[in-house]
Regions:
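N-terminal intrinsically disordered, cationic/polar leader segments
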Residues: 1-98, 106-140
Length: 140
């Protein structure tokens, strides 16, 4: 049985950058541009916590792509996993992401709200299978 428990999470970095050169196009409904990256850090000891870092970027390269702003939310979750061997990383990538994403979505919505923009940004539920792979790091 594979059991995953989210013990804690923290925002490593929350960045909001307004694009003051943004030129809205008339009658255009701007679609959200979302990029997801993840990194896993774990020890070889099964009882030790494992760490899943998620970086969500909304409107990447805002000035170049003519987006109104850019948000980067970098969040790390601390998990305990009941699984054996190499299955631990696969279990974390599949289940940990699903557990952590609602918190990341809320953080991003709050950033936009605090920026006092006229239109709220609420991210849709995100699909972990759309992730862009990042080289995993091994814990010391």
């Amino acid at each position: 049985m594979n059991d995953v428990r989210l013990a804690d999470f923290r925002a490593e970095s929350l960045q909001f950058d307004m694009n003051h050169h943004f030129q809205p196009k008339e009658n255009e409904n701007l679609q959200l541009s979302i990029k997801l990256d993840q990194r896993v850090r774990m020890s070889s000891t099964p009882k030790e916590p494992v760490f899943l870092n998620i970086r969500v970027t909304v409107f990447d390269n805002a000035e170049v792509n003519n987006y109104p702003f850019e948000i980067i939310a970098d969040v790390t979750g601390v998990f305990f996993i009941e699984a054996e061997g190499s299955d631990r990383e696969a279990v974390l990538r599949d289940n940990g992401m699903v557990m952590l994403l609602p918190y990341v979505r809320a953080m991003i919505s709050q950033l936009v709200s605090l920026a006092n923009l006229p239109t709220p940004v609420i991210l849709p539920p995100l699909d972990p299978s759309q992730m862009q792979p990042v080289e995993p790091e091994q814990a010391q």
